[in-house]
Amino acid sequence: MASRRLLSSLLRSSSRRSVSKSPISNINPKLSSSSPSSKSRASPYGYLLTRAAEYATSAAAAAPPQPPPAKPEGGKGGGKITDEFTGKGAIGQVCQVIGAVVDVRFDEGLPPILTSLEVLDHSIRLVLEVAQHMGEGMVRTIAMDGTEGLVRGQRVLNTGSPITVPVGRANPWTYHEVIGEPIDERGDIKTSHFLPIHREAPAFVDQATEQQILVTGIKVVDLLAPYQRGGKIGLFGGAGVGKTVLIMELINNVAKAHGGFSVFAGVGERTREGNDLYREMIESGVIKLGDKQADSKCALVYGQMNEPPGARARVGLTGLTVAEHFRDAEGQDVLLFIDNIFRFTQANSEVSALLGRIPSAVGYQPTLATDLGGLQERITTTKKGSITSVQAIYVPADDLTDPAPATTFAHLDATTVLSRQISELGIYPAVDPLDSTSRMLSPHILGEEHYNTARGVQKVLQNYKNLQDIIAILGMDELSEDDKLTVARARKIQRFLSQPFHVAEVFTGAPGKYVELKESITSFQGVLDGKYDDLPEQSFYMVGGIDEVIAKADKIAKESAS
């Protein structure tokens, strides 16, 4: 502005020194509208000076005052603040949108970290979670859904609380997403119970420290790799080995034997797999629709693979919050499935990168152990009930030393390994009895009888595995009598570990079997002692207890005799 005023004064002084007929001797507004044929344009020099003087004088004029920007309705900063600590009710404005990261400015009522914000005047319900305070009233948030259509200046409401989700036996609510919105198009969720997804783990004085077995009714699990009530179990299995069927049978058995409820959290699930699981649960009766929906045994919470990282990073907490309600409010033994726990870590790694944090080893977030610990420590047994978690685990490049699975292993109480080799033999569930482990397999917890039987079964199976190379090369005839007896018992045990499932009745036509733990111990101990050496190994295949083995052997004998 000062330079333009200087130019203006120089031009005026130049005009005073020029001849009286000079075009700039009488500068006035009319000059700007004079025609090109005017006498004042006889000299090109005079024309240029005229334009320069006109620009300088007009630019030097003070700009007219602009009206102040209109404030949002509802008072200073917009919105009526009802809580001074959380800023609940304050209205902010979107300042920047970069993918899943949204920056919001608040004149007052700054929301704390992890507070849920809701975008107003948007086509969908878009929830933002505060992740960082940037200063000067600016917060950086992570979106729980797509940010398409979001624009700068759009209003954002501070809800004053973390993300809350509906809990309880709402009707209908079986199938919903990270923020509690139903996605099965069966109507709105009707409930008055909501809980925040960010909660503290139960206090130590409220936890039940006594170690107890959660009986599943599945022989191979209860005998060789028992689940701890309130423990964490890692489920390893590739595609097509029966992982989904095992999950559904666990849900069914826990509901029938313990009256418990199950929650399935699909973290980074393929949409197709999630839909298949939903349909199969409806067909098997685990999920009931219509008038019988209150009798459903399972709730599904999905943050699918195509969702933004914020949704995938929080859907595990949503499922856990639903499970916590059934544990604490209804005193139930809840079964929580998380598929896949690696996707939870992966999503938090993406969020960390979006927030500009320096990555740790192998590109993971520096808060890897904290993020995973915050989830795992809430999965525990209290004096009211328990949450037993079965978590599918993906191991990147089969590297067990990768930070993500290595950190997860530290929290596990048991591992259930599904083997493709066993499934190829037609033995279901295809649980590997030698690779599956449990911290509960101790005589101090299980008792001497259970422990000795389990170790005896594993010893026979391991000896059989060691003899398989010799059998393949030389044949059974070259084995000693003791080895032949070991092989015969091992093959019977291997088939006796199979079991018909209730949820597979529609496929196999065989009724499902629930086997009590005591019966499993007695039956397998009898096989180890040689009480059933005279029975054919076919009679041990796909049955429940030992009584069914004897009945099946008699039936086979009668058919052979006839």
Swiss-Prot record:
Residues 1-43, 58-83 are annotated as: Disordered. GO terms for molecular function: ATP binding; ATP hydrolysis activity; proton-transporting ATP synthase activity, rotational mechanism. CDD domains: ATP-synt_F1_beta_C, ATP-synt_F1_beta_N, F1-ATPase_beta_CD. Its main location: mitochondrion. SMART domains: AAA (SM00382). GO terms for cellular component: mitochondrial inner membrane; proton-transporting ATP synthase complex. Residues 1-13, 20-40 have a biased composition (Low complexity). It is an enzyme of class 7 (translocase). Its EC number is 7.1.2.2. It catalyses: ATP + H2O + 4 H(+)(in) = ADP + phosphate + 5 H(+)(out). GO terms for biological process: proton motive force-driven mitochondrial ATP synthesis. Mitochondrial membrane ATP synthase (F(1)F(0) ATP synthase or Complex V) produces ATP from ADP in the presence of a proton gradient across the membrane which is generated by electron transport complexes of the respiratory chain. F-type ATPases consist of two structural domains, F(1) - containing the extramembraneous catalytic core, and F(0) - containing the membrane proton channel, linked together by a central stalk and a peripheral stalk. During catalysis, ATP synthesis in the catalytic domain of F(1) is coupled via a rotary mechanism of the central stalk subunits to proton translocation. F-type ATPases have 2 components, CF(1) - the catalytic core - and CF(0) - the membrane proton channel. CF(1) has five subunits: alpha(3), beta(3), gamma(1), delta(1), epsilon(1). CF(0) has three main subunits: a, b and c. Belongs to the ATPase alpha/beta chains family. This is ATP synthase subunit beta, mitochondrial.
